[in-house]
């Protein structure tokens, strides 16, 4: 596999939490629409099972809260999640400057 392909996989499907926290930072997102939203905004279509796993872990660790929106499961990024997202952005900025 070419290096760019490995890199693309690691920063997309390998780090779904970044995309979930980003999408849910301003509005609640329904679980069933997350794949489509990620595809529309970030250009890749993640596996549904991976999304469920990431949501479970993010909720368990307090990075997202689980809500009901129109009777369906939805998620919103918590303050803890926003801080984690800001830390990731800072890390990426520093890394890009070093490259």
Regions inferred by a protein language model and the residue ranges of each:
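Beta-hairpin "wing" of winged helix-turn-helix
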Residues: 59-70, 76
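Short, Lys/Arg-enriched N-terminal segment that forms or immediately precedes the first helix
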Residues: 1-9
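Basic, amphipathic "hinge/linker" alpha-helix immediately C-terminal to the N-terminal HTH DNA-binding motif
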Residues: 70-88
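Short, leucine-enriched amphipathic alpha-helices that occur as contiguous helical runs
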Residues: 13-20, 48
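Amphipathic alpha-helical dimerization/coiled-coil segments
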Residues: 83-99
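Short capping segments at the starts of secondary-structure elements
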Residues: 15, 23-33
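DNA-recognition alpha helix
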Residues: 32-43
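Short amphipathic alpha-helical interaction segments
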Residues: 44-57
